[in-house]
Amino acid sequence: MNQTNLDFLATSDPALAAIIDRELQRQRTHIELIASENFTSAAVMAAQGSVLTNKYAEGLPGKRYYGGCEFVDQAETLAISRVKELFGAAHANVQPHSGAQANFAVFLTLLQPGDTIMGMDLSHGGHLTHGSPVNVSGKWFEVAHYGVEKETGRLDYDKIRQQALEVKPKLLICGYSAYPRQIEFDKFRAIADEVGAYLMADIAHIAGLVASGHHPSPLPYCDVVTTTTHKTLRGPRGGLIMTNNEELGKKFDKSVFPGTQGGPLEHVITAKAVAFGEALKPEFKVYSGQVIANAQAMADQLQKRGFDLVSGGTDNHLMLVDLRSIAMTGKVGDQLLGEINITANKNTVPFDPESPFVTSGLRLGSPAMTTRGMQEDEFRTIANIIADRLLSPEDEGVKADCLRRVSELCAGFPLYDHLRIPVAVIA
């Protein structure tokens, strides 16, 4: 029998092997609704755990500072060509270690300390790296934040335009971590042109939907597009920069290395190449469409059970549930769902009176459980389980019944059946 990496780990470090086994069991037995999480394929994990982890390769393919890079050059070149085809981009850099690193490289290219950036407020669904005061982006640059409308939970592009005319940002940022509606990139382009700003789209959450044609692409409109490679794209954890401007692309390359990073993680880049190849297949388009259908089914059922959703629903993979109508905080809701093996995350809602550590909302997403094969009926069932638990938080009988239903759902949609950690060794 051929030994696997997990066999070696169980022999050499049984304590860590046991931890990994417990995490595997958690993933198998829990309903995963964190919108930024997904389950990668076995092929992605195999690439990331390969011998490419041993290779240093500062620079770009064909222009390395180390010898012996001929094969990692091939892998990285394949990742670049695949992602360019996937998104229709003229230029791509696959080296950023994360979405935040990709954003920092863009800032280094386009901005000087003290320049003004304009992005969505974190409490309205933006991201830390879009100018939050606790992040480097909020410390190095002047920041103007826009948000959604209180009545609709949606962007008002006329108001964003008026704000941009007043503050005249050098960089206008669109793309969010908790906005459940489609983004109109053409309207942002018009605003950026009017004020003379660069336009950046951070599509970390919707990248898979964009790649599969289920969300409009920002590339025809934006000077630069950044993203993570996990979430809806279902690859390894990492970042990516794309542009249709070749001259800017060369500058972004220099801002990644040597500007913000040293050696690239070639094992992760190879895993990205695997994921990009998977996303180019017809099955991925079907998957992405199902992600949206499942999110909408869950959102509709939650509304039927009396829950308020920010903006009244969703166009993508996520939704924000405002728990103020049932006098519950996001922190409590998160804990209650955790007790029945549903993993979600507390999240601020627009105009939230609670602190970010408490919040008034829950963010729920469909990508991970869609990967496990669940469809609309299962997501309506999940919505009912959530409603039953949150509407009867003190009822131990309801809690036990919810836990049973979660267990049955997970058992019907197995995860990583091929993975085996030799428990005899780690016991």
Swiss-Prot record:
Keyword hit for Cytoplasm: yes
Cofactor or coenzyme needed: pyridoxal 5'-phosphate
Main location: cytoplasm
Entry keyword set: Amino-acid biosynthesis, Cytoplasm, One-carbon metabolism, Pyridoxal phosphate, Transferase
Assembly description: Homodimer.
CDD domains, alphabetized: SHMT (cd00378)
Organism field: Synechocystis sp. (strain ATCC 27184 / PCC 6803 / Kazusa)
PROSITE patterns referenced in this protein's UniProt entry, alphabetically: SHMT
Metabolic or biological pathway, per its Swiss-Prot or TrEMBL entry: One-carbon metabolism; tetrahydrofolate interconversion; Amino-acid biosynthesis; glycine biosynthesis; glycine from L-serine: step 1/1
Family: Belongs to the SHMT family.
MF term (GO), any: glycine hydroxymethyltransferase activity
Gene3D superfamilies assigned: Aspartate Aminotransferase, domain 1, Type I PLP-dependent aspartate aminotransferase-like (Major domain)
InterPro entries in UniProt: PyrdxlP-dep_Trfase (IPR015424), PyrdxlP-dep_Trfase_major (IPR015421), PyrdxlP-dep_Trfase_small (IPR015422), Ser_HO-MeTrfase (IPR001085), Ser_HO-MeTrfase-like (IPR049943), Ser_HO-MeTrfase_PLP_BS (IPR019798), SHMT-like_dom (IPR039429)
Gene Ontology CC: one annotated term: cytosol
Entry function: Catalyzes the reversible interconversion of serine and glycine with tetrahydrofolate (THF) serving as the one-carbon carrier. This reaction serves as the major source of one-carbon groups required for the biosynthesis of purines, thymidylate, methionine, and other important biomolecules. Also exhibits THF-independent aldolase activity toward beta-hydroxyamino acids, producing glycine and aldehydes, via a retro-aldol mechanism.
SUPFAM superfamilies linked: PLP-dependent transferases
UniProt-annotated binding residues for (6S)-5,6,7,8-tetrahydrofolate: L122, G126, H127, L128, E247, S355, P356, F357
Protein name: Serine hydroxymethyltransferase
Enzyme class, broadest EC rank: transferase
